[in-house]
């Protein structure tokens, strides 16, 4: 028996418009937001979250905490997350709100811990169904396994290779619509999934448009986005907002898998001090300033940051832009005041949508149906997940480290170098690891019954969940220099992506300079010798990075490419070879990149 029958009834009221009208040519006519109460108003509660990434169990280490700003200006670390607590939080929040809709901003699955990832994220889709998700945009990670797998997650059906995981049970797919307005088939030009949907309840109608970042092909393997075209976020949202407006749907929310970087890491930081939107930077700011005033609120994601900002729309009216960090640690509650007369959301300086982020605390009762779901899938995963693969003496921070060089990044790069150094494995001299591929920390505290300091297969998989194949290529010293300069120039100049480097490679990152000059070439050495632009070096990386992903096109110039083991297998082999109960692995010093600020 479902624990959430009211949500199931409400979900049926979320109806999708399937007809896609031809886009009007020329400049879209702008229309200001509802500015007066021409009829009775009703408050609609919108609960939202993003970047869940299949974290059904409470995340470990710093990935399972949020920073809370205290009245005296200090920060407090609060444990957070876990779908048992997320479901309880959302269900409690809905009480007393007859008009409530729950929305997501992408990356609900993908790069997931083993318990979800090894089952192609079917457990996470099942969990989203149970907790009452009404609608979500796609994110870049929804494309990790390609278009067909994403459509299977929407429509259901057993995995084409692995089949069904439970006897007599067929995967039903998502009860909620995945929206992908800016993702079209290269041949037909049509969206591969619905571009928008309309939520209806007692005469209230709110349109939801969903998009992922235009740069998705830069952060997903080529195979994952094969045959697809990713359009601009602003132009796509404006197109479908116009279409919804013509259909009489005036209240519109955009679900955007692209985000910003707040000035503070605290979830309750005031983004609007000293003025509206003053405390945020990044891609979402420009998007928010250009999206048509027909859209009343933006629910965003991708950067795993927490913020609630007011960024004025092109007409100057206040508009709320939200993000709820990641991994189910927070949810956002936004109040949308719907005017039955104008059929729009009220947005005036005196009254406009207000939002607040709430912590998914672990001191509340667990949702029993989610506990049962976790226990069921955990039992299926246990033979693989609980196997010890290594030992550590303390936390080794990766995802949770704010440093450019992360201790766990050093471990992973060393593991990849060791795996690909033998001549028959590629003969690598250097290994480079993209920081975005480090999905968690290695926590010393036990996550189950394995004991403190024991690293299980499941924990190692959570750090490296993509199972990318490892590649080694020939790069000249000049190409290697260009590659390292791309960390801080071109598309990565505003938000540097500092690659994690294997032992022996050292250099100085000078942040007092601009662009490519931040890489001090006079300090760039391999085993103490300066990198020679004319010499050839054998460089290892996961296949995504070696294919030019994350804004590193210099990697595509590599020659004599050789594929060998997977990244997670290399990582596990290294942990096993370099640790034991009596001699656990210590966190490395992370002293290969010297940072000058």
Language-model-derived ranges and their functions:
Residues 367, 372, 385, 389, ...:
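Long, compositionally biased non-active-site segments enriched in small/hydrophobic residues and glycine
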Residues 362-365, 410:
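Conserved, carboxylate-rich catalytic/transport cores that coordinate ions
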Residues 2-5, 36-358, 411-418, 431, ...:
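Acidic, metal/ion-coordinating pockets
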Residues 1-36:
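Secretory targeting and sorting signals
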Residues 385-405:
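Glycine-rich phosphate/diphosphate-binding loops and the adjacent beta-loop-alpha structural elements
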Residues 221-222, 317-318, 395-400, 464-467:
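Flexible glycine/proline-enriched surface loops and loop-helix/loop-strand junctions
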Residues 34, 210-222, 350-352, 378, ...:
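N-terminal accessory/precursor segments of enzymes
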Residues 42-45, 55, 65, 166-182, ...:
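Feature captures C-terminal
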């Amino acid at each position: 028996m479902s624990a959430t029958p009211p949500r199931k009834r409400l979900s049926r009221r979320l109806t999708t418009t399937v007809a896609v009208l031809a886009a009007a040519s020329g400049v879209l006519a702008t229309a200001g937001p509802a500015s007066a109460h021409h009829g009775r108003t009703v408050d609609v509660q919108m609960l939202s979250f993003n970047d869940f990434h299949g974290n059904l169990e409470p995340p470990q280490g710093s990935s399972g905490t949020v920073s809370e700003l205290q009245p005296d200006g200090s920060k407090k670390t609060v444990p957070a997350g876990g779908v048992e607590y997320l479901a309880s939080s959302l269900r409690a929040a809905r009480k007393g709100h007859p008009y409530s809709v729950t929305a997501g901003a992408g990356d609900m699955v993908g790069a997931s811990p083993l318990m979800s990832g090894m089952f192609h994220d079917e457990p996470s889709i099942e969990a989203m169904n149970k907790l009452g998700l009404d609608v979500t945009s796609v994110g870049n990670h929804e494309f990790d396994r390609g278009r067909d797998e994403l459509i299977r997650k929407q429509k259901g059906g057993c995995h084409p290779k692995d089949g069904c995981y439970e006897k007599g049970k067929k995967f039903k797919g998502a009860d909620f619509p995945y929206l992908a307005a800016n993702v079209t088939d290269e041949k037909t030009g049509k969206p591969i999934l619905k571009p928008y949907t309309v939520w209806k309840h007692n005469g209230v109608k709110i349109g939801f448009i969903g998009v992922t970042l235009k740069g998705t092909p830069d952060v997903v393997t080529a195979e994952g986005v094969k045959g697809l075209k990713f359009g601009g976020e602003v132009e796509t949202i404006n197109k479908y907002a116009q279409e919804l407006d013509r259909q009489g749907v005036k209240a519109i929310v955009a679900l955007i898998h692209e985000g910003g970087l707040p000035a503070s890491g605290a979830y309750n930081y005031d983004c609007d001090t000293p003025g509206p939107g003053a405390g945020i930077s990044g891609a979402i700011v420009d998007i928010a300033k250009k999206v048509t005033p027909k859209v009343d609120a933006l629910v965003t994601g991708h950067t795993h940051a927490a913020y609630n900002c007011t960024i004025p729309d092109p007409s100057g009216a206040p508009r709320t832009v939200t993000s709820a960090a990641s991994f189910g640690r927070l949810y956002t509650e936004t109040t949308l005041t719907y005017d039955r007369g104008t059929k729009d959301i009220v947005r005036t300086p005196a009254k406009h949508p207000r939002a607040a982020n709430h912590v998914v605390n672990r001191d509340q009762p667990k949702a029993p149906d989610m506990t049962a779901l976790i226990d069921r899938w955990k039992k299926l995963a246990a033979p693989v997940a609980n196997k010890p693969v290594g030992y550590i003496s303390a936390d080794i921070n990766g995802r949770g480290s704010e440093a450019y060089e992360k201790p766990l990044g050093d471990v992973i790069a060393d593991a990849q170098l060791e795996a690909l150094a033998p001549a028959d494995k590629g003969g690598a001299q250097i290994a480079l690891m993209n920081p975005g591929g480090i999905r968690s920390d290695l926590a010393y505290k036990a996550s189950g019954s394995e004991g403190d300091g024991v690293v299980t297969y499941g924990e190692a998989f959570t750090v490296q969940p993509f199972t990318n194949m490892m590649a080694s290529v020939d790069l000249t010293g000049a190409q290697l220099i260009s590659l390292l300069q791309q960390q801080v120039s071109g598309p990565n100049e505003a938000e540097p992506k500092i690659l994690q480097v294997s032992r022996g490679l050292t250099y100085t990152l000078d942040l007092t300079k601009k662009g490519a000059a931040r890489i001090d070439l006079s300090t760039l050495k391999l085993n103490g010798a300066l990198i020679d632009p004319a010499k050839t070096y054998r460089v290892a990386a996961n296949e995504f990075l070696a294919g030019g992903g994350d804004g590193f096109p210099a990697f595509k110039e590599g020659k004599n490419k050789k594929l060998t083991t997977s990244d997670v297998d290399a990582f596990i082999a290294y942990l096993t070879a370099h640790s034991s109960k009596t001699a656990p692995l210590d966190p490395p010093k992370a002293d290969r990149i010297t940072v000058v600020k």
